[in-house]
Protein backbone atom coordinates (compact mmCIF):
# COMPACT_ATOMS: atom_id res chain seq x y z
CA UNK A 1 0.00 0.00 0.00
CA UNK A 2 1.23 3.50 -0.89
CA UNK A 3 0.12 6.70 0.78
CA UNK A 4 -1.16 9.78 -1.02
CA UNK A 5 0.07 13.30 -0.38
CA UNK A 6 2.63 15.84 -1.50
CA UNK A 7 6.35 16.46 -1.32
CA UNK A 8 7.73 20.00 -1.20
CA UNK A 9 10.79 19.72 -3.41
CA UNK A 10 13.75 22.06 -3.78
CA UNK A 11 14.49 21.98 -7.49
CA UNK A 12 18.15 22.43 -8.47
CA UNK A 13 19.23 24.34 -11.56
CA UNK A 14 19.78 22.67 -14.95
CA UNK A 15 17.11 20.02 -14.50
CA UNK A 16 13.57 20.24 -15.84
CA UNK A 17 10.55 19.96 -13.56
CA UNK A 18 9.53 16.82 -15.44
CA UNK A 19 12.94 15.23 -14.85
CA UNK A 20 12.80 16.12 -11.16
CA UNK A 21 9.35 14.59 -10.68
CA UNK A 22 10.37 11.50 -12.62
CA UNK A 23 13.43 11.00 -10.43
CA UNK A 24 11.25 11.15 -7.31
CA UNK A 25 8.93 8.57 -8.88
CA UNK A 26 11.81 6.19 -9.60
CA UNK A 27 13.59 6.71 -6.30
CA UNK A 28 10.53 5.94 -4.17
CA UNK A 29 8.85 3.61 -6.68
CA UNK A 30 5.72 5.76 -6.68
CA UNK A 31 2.82 4.59 -8.82
CA UNK A 32 1.45 8.00 -9.79
CA UNK A 33 3.02 11.48 -9.63
CA UNK A 34 2.28 14.99 -10.83
CA UNK A 35 3.23 18.56 -10.01
CA UNK A 36 1.70 22.00 -9.44
CA UNK A 37 3.49 24.23 -11.91
CA UNK A 38 6.77 24.02 -13.79
CA UNK A 39 9.94 25.97 -13.16
CA UNK A 40 12.31 27.06 -15.91
CA UNK A 41 15.33 24.85 -16.53
CA UNK A 42 17.74 27.34 -14.92
CA UNK A 43 15.38 28.19 -12.05
CA UNK A 44 15.58 26.73 -8.56
CA UNK A 45 13.24 26.42 -5.61
CA UNK A 46 9.81 25.15 -4.62
CA UNK A 47 8.12 22.49 -6.74
CA UNK A 48 5.07 20.69 -5.36
CA UNK A 49 5.16 16.97 -6.19
CA UNK A 50 1.76 15.27 -6.04
CA UNK A 51 1.72 11.60 -5.09
CA UNK A 52 -0.99 9.09 -6.01
CA UNK A 53 -4.49 10.43 -5.16
CA UNK A 54 -3.06 13.88 -4.42
CA UNK A 55 -2.86 14.33 -8.20
CA UNK A 56 -6.63 14.89 -7.99
CA UNK A 57 -6.09 18.22 -6.20
CA UNK A 58 -3.52 19.57 -8.67
CA UNK A 59 -5.86 22.22 -10.12
CA UNK A 60 -6.54 23.70 -6.68
CA UNK A 61 -2.91 23.89 -5.58
CA UNK A 62 -1.90 25.14 -9.04
CA UNK A 63 -4.09 28.22 -8.54
CA UNK A 64 -2.02 29.34 -5.55
CA UNK A 65 0.01 32.54 -5.52
CA UNK A 66 3.78 32.32 -5.85
CA UNK A 67 6.86 34.20 -4.61
CA UNK A 68 10.27 34.48 -6.26
CA UNK A 69 13.66 36.04 -5.94
CA UNK A 70 14.96 37.18 -9.31
CA UNK A 71 18.17 38.80 -10.51
CA UNK A 72 17.95 40.87 -13.70
CA UNK A 73 20.93 41.78 -15.89
CA UNK A 74 20.46 45.19 -17.49
CA UNK A 75 21.42 46.40 -21.00
CA UNK A 76 21.29 42.96 -22.67
CA UNK A 77 18.32 40.97 -24.03
CA UNK A 78 18.06 37.28 -24.97
CA UNK A 79 15.40 35.56 -27.06
CA UNK A 80 14.24 33.49 -24.07
CA UNK A 81 14.42 36.41 -21.60
CA UNK A 82 16.87 34.40 -19.47
CA UNK A 83 20.49 33.24 -19.50
CA UNK A 84 19.61 30.09 -21.41
CA UNK A 85 18.80 32.01 -24.58
CA UNK A 86 20.80 33.70 -27.31
CA UNK A 87 21.68 37.38 -27.06
CA UNK A 88 19.57 39.33 -29.56
CA UNK A 89 20.19 42.90 -28.41
CA UNK A 90 22.72 44.90 -26.42
CA UNK A 91 22.74 48.48 -25.26
CA UNK A 92 25.49 50.80 -24.15
CA UNK A 93 25.18 51.00 -20.35
CA UNK A 94 24.02 54.30 -18.89
CA UNK A 95 23.40 55.52 -15.39
CA UNK A 96 20.19 54.39 -13.73
CA UNK A 97 19.80 55.80 -10.25
CA UNK A 98 18.49 53.93 -7.24
CA UNK A 99 15.61 56.41 -7.08
CA UNK A 100 14.63 55.57 -10.66
CA UNK A 101 14.61 51.87 -9.88
CA UNK A 102 12.56 52.32 -6.71
CA UNK A 103 10.06 54.47 -8.60
CA UNK A 104 9.57 51.81 -11.28
CA UNK A 105 9.45 48.99 -8.71
CA UNK A 106 6.73 50.80 -6.77
CA UNK A 107 4.48 50.50 -9.83
CA UNK A 108 4.48 46.73 -9.43
CA UNK A 109 2.65 46.61 -6.12
CA UNK A 110 -0.96 45.38 -6.26
CA UNK A 111 -0.62 45.85 -10.01
CA UNK A 112 -2.82 43.90 -12.43
CA UNK A 113 -1.94 43.98 -16.11
CA UNK A 114 -2.01 42.03 -19.35
CA UNK A 115 1.33 40.23 -19.60
CA UNK A 116 2.76 38.65 -22.73
CA UNK A 117 4.50 35.33 -22.01
CA UNK A 118 7.91 34.60 -23.55
CA UNK A 119 8.00 32.79 -26.89
CA UNK A 120 10.12 30.17 -25.13
CA UNK A 121 7.35 28.90 -22.86
CA UNK A 122 5.01 25.92 -22.58
CA UNK A 123 1.80 27.81 -23.23
CA UNK A 124 -0.14 26.14 -26.02
CA UNK A 125 -1.51 27.88 -29.11
CA UNK A 126 -3.53 25.73 -31.52
CA UNK A 127 -2.27 22.57 -29.84
CA UNK A 128 1.42 23.46 -29.99
CA UNK A 129 3.63 24.90 -27.28
CA UNK A 130 5.05 28.35 -27.95
CA UNK A 131 8.64 27.14 -27.75
CA UNK A 132 7.88 24.65 -30.53
CA UNK A 133 6.97 27.56 -32.80
CA UNK A 134 10.20 29.31 -31.79
CA UNK A 135 12.38 26.28 -32.48
CA UNK A 136 10.95 25.90 -35.99
CA UNK A 137 10.97 29.67 -36.72
CA UNK A 138 7.20 29.72 -37.20
CA UNK A 139 5.18 32.87 -36.66
CA UNK A 140 2.56 32.70 -33.95
CA UNK A 141 0.33 35.23 -32.24
CA UNK A 142 1.17 35.46 -28.55
CA UNK A 143 -1.85 36.51 -26.54
CA UNK A 144 -1.56 38.39 -23.28
CA UNK A 145 -2.81 37.01 -19.97
CA UNK A 146 -4.06 38.96 -16.98
CA UNK A 147 -1.72 38.61 -13.99
CA UNK A 148 -1.35 40.40 -10.67
CA UNK A 149 1.91 41.43 -9.05
CA UNK A 150 1.04 41.76 -5.37
CA UNK A 151 4.37 43.04 -4.11
CA UNK A 152 7.81 43.78 -5.55
CA UNK A 153 10.72 44.65 -3.26
CA UNK A 154 14.24 45.69 -4.19
CA UNK A 155 16.77 43.47 -2.41
CA UNK A 156 19.89 44.99 -3.94
CA UNK A 157 21.20 47.00 -6.89
CA UNK A 158 24.68 46.16 -8.18
CA UNK A 159 25.50 49.17 -10.34
CA UNK A 160 28.96 47.83 -11.20
CA UNK A 161 27.58 44.63 -12.74
CA UNK A 162 24.28 46.18 -13.87
CA UNK A 163 22.14 43.77 -11.85
CA UNK A 164 18.87 44.29 -9.98
CA UNK A 165 17.85 41.74 -7.33
CA UNK A 166 14.12 41.60 -6.53
CA UNK A 167 11.63 39.76 -4.36
CA UNK A 168 8.28 39.26 -6.13
CA UNK A 169 4.92 37.99 -4.91
CA UNK A 170 2.49 37.31 -7.74
CA UNK A 171 -0.57 35.45 -8.98
CA UNK A 172 -0.51 32.09 -10.74
CA UNK A 173 0.43 32.24 -14.39
CA UNK A 174 2.88 35.11 -13.98
CA UNK A 175 6.05 34.77 -16.04
CA UNK A 176 8.88 36.33 -14.07
CA UNK A 177 10.99 36.48 -17.24
CA UNK A 178 8.32 38.66 -18.85
CA UNK A 179 8.02 40.75 -15.69
CA UNK A 180 11.79 41.35 -15.81
CA UNK A 181 11.56 42.57 -19.40
CA UNK A 182 8.57 44.80 -18.53
CA UNK A 183 10.43 46.37 -15.61
CA UNK A 184 13.41 47.04 -17.86
CA UNK A 185 11.13 48.71 -20.42
CA UNK A 186 9.91 51.03 -17.69
CA UNK A 187 13.57 51.85 -17.02
CA UNK A 188 13.98 52.64 -20.75
CA UNK A 189 16.35 49.75 -21.22
CA UNK A 190 16.49 45.99 -21.82
CA UNK A 191 17.38 43.06 -19.58
CA UNK A 192 17.10 39.35 -18.91
CA UNK A 193 16.91 36.97 -15.95
CA UNK A 194 20.20 35.53 -14.72
CA UNK A 195 18.87 33.97 -11.50
CA UNK A 196 15.40 32.80 -10.47
CA UNK A 197 14.39 31.07 -7.24
CA UNK A 198 10.82 30.22 -6.25
CA UNK A 199 10.54 30.74 -2.51
CA UNK A 200 6.82 30.14 -2.03
CA UNK A 201 3.96 28.25 -3.67
CA UNK A 202 0.70 28.85 -1.84
CA UNK A 203 1.74 28.46 1.79
CA UNK A 204 4.50 25.96 1.02
CA UNK A 205 7.85 27.57 1.81
CA UNK A 206 11.35 27.00 0.48
CA UNK A 207 12.72 26.43 3.99
CA UNK A 208 10.50 23.34 4.22
CA UNK A 209 11.51 21.98 0.82
CA UNK A 210 13.50 18.75 0.47
CA UNK A 211 16.48 18.13 -1.79
CA UNK A 212 16.09 15.17 -4.12
CA UNK A 213 19.05 13.32 -2.57
CA UNK A 214 17.46 13.43 0.89
CA UNK A 215 13.86 12.61 0.05
CA UNK A 216 12.03 9.75 1.75
CA UNK A 217 8.44 8.78 2.54
CA UNK A 218 8.90 10.45 5.92
CA UNK A 219 8.72 13.81 4.13
CA UNK A 220 5.27 13.14 2.65
CA UNK A 221 2.60 15.68 3.63
CA UNK A 222 -0.91 14.22 3.74
CA UNK A 223 -3.71 15.53 1.54
CA UNK A 224 -5.46 16.70 4.72
CA UNK A 225 -2.49 18.79 5.82
CA UNK A 226 -1.82 20.08 2.29
CA UNK A 227 -5.38 21.38 1.95
CA UNK A 228 -5.54 22.88 5.43
CA UNK A 229 -2.10 24.49 5.08
CA UNK A 230 -3.40 26.43 2.08
CA UNK A 231 -6.52 27.73 3.83
CA UNK A 232 -9.14 26.10 1.62
CA UNK A 233 -12.68 25.93 2.97
CA UNK A 234 -13.16 22.57 4.70
CA UNK A 235 -16.62 21.48 5.87
CA UNK A 236 -17.25 18.50 8.15
CA UNK A 237 -20.14 16.31 6.95
CA UNK A 238 -21.73 13.68 9.18
CA UNK A 239 -22.83 11.11 6.59
CA UNK A 240 -19.54 10.15 4.95
CA UNK A 241 -21.25 7.34 3.00
CA UNK A 242 -23.14 9.94 0.95
CA UNK A 243 -19.82 11.57 0.09
CA UNK A 244 -18.19 8.27 -0.84
CA UNK A 245 -21.19 7.51 -3.08
CA UNK A 246 -20.90 10.94 -4.71
CA UNK A 247 -24.40 12.11 -3.81
CA UNK A 248 -25.57 15.72 -3.86
CA UNK A 249 -25.62 17.25 -0.39
CA UNK A 250 -27.13 20.25 1.35
CA UNK A 251 -24.80 22.69 3.09
CA UNK A 252 -26.33 25.67 4.86
CA UNK A 253 -24.66 29.04 5.45
CA UNK A 254 -21.77 28.36 3.06
CA UNK A 255 -20.79 31.32 0.88
CA UNK A 256 -17.97 29.54 -0.94
CA UNK A 257 -18.65 27.99 -4.35
CA UNK A 258 -16.06 25.29 -3.78
CA UNK A 259 -15.51 23.33 -0.55
CA UNK A 260 -13.56 20.31 0.62
CA UNK A 261 -15.64 17.80 2.58
CA UNK A 262 -14.24 15.90 5.56
CA UNK A 263 -15.62 13.12 7.75
CA UNK A 264 -15.91 13.05 11.55
CA UNK A 265 -12.22 12.15 11.84
CA UNK A 266 -11.26 15.24 9.79
CA UNK A 267 -10.21 13.12 6.80
CA UNK A 268 -10.82 15.03 3.58
CA UNK A 269 -12.91 12.88 1.25
CA UNK A 270 -13.92 15.00 -1.72
CA UNK A 271 -14.31 18.38 -3.39
CA UNK A 272 -17.85 19.71 -3.78
CA UNK A 273 -19.11 22.62 -5.88
CA UNK A 274 -22.20 24.75 -5.31
CA UNK A 275 -24.97 23.59 -7.64
CA UNK A 276 -28.01 25.61 -6.63
CA UNK A 277 -28.50 27.76 -3.52
CA UNK A 278 -27.45 25.45 -0.66
CA UNK A 279 -27.14 22.31 -2.82
CA UNK A 280 -23.64 21.06 -3.62
CA UNK A 281 -22.57 18.34 -6.04
CA UNK A 282 -19.36 16.35 -6.13
CA UNK A 283 -16.52 17.64 -8.29
CA UNK A 284 -13.71 15.30 -7.23
CA UNK A 285 -13.93 12.26 -4.97
CA UNK A 286 -11.71 9.53 -3.57
CA UNK A 287 -9.20 11.89 -2.00
CA UNK A 288 -8.63 9.85 1.15
CA UNK A 289 -7.98 6.49 -0.50
CA UNK A 290 -4.49 5.03 -0.44
CA UNK A 291 -3.11 3.24 -3.50
CA UNK A 292 -2.66 -0.53 -3.42
Swiss-Prot record:
Catalytic residue positions: 40 (nucleophile)
EC number(s) given by UniProt: 5.4.99.25
Keywords: Isomerase, tRNA processing
Gene3D superfamilies the UniProt entry points to: Pseudouridine synthase
Catalytic activity: uridine(55) in tRNA = pseudouridine(55) in tRNA
Record SUPFAM superfamilies: Pseudouridine synthase
A biological-process GO annotation: tRNA pseudouridine synthesis
Cross-referenced CDD domains: PseudoU_synth_EcTruB (cd02573)
Keyword Cell membrane: no
GO terms, molecular function: RNA binding; tRNA pseudouridine(55) synthase activity
Keyword Cell wall biogenesis/degradation: no
Role: Responsible for synthesis of pseudouridine from uracil-55 in the psi GC loop of transfer RNAs.
Family membership noted in the UniProt record: Belongs to the pseudouridine synthase TruB family. Type 1 subfamily.
NCBIfam families for the chain: TruB (TIGR00431)
Protein name: tRNA pseudouridine synthase B
Organism: Mycoplasma mycoides subsp. mycoides SC (strain CCUG 32753 / NCTC 10114 / PG1)
Amino acid sequence: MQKSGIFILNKPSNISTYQLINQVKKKLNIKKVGHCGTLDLLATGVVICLVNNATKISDYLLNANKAYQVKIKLFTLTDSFDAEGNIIQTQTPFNISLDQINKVISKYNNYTYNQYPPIYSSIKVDGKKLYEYALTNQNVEIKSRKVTIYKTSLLSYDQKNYEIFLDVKCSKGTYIRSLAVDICKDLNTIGYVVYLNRTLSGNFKLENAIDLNNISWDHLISINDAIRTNDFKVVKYQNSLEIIQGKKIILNDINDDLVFISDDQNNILAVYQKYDNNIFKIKRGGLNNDIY
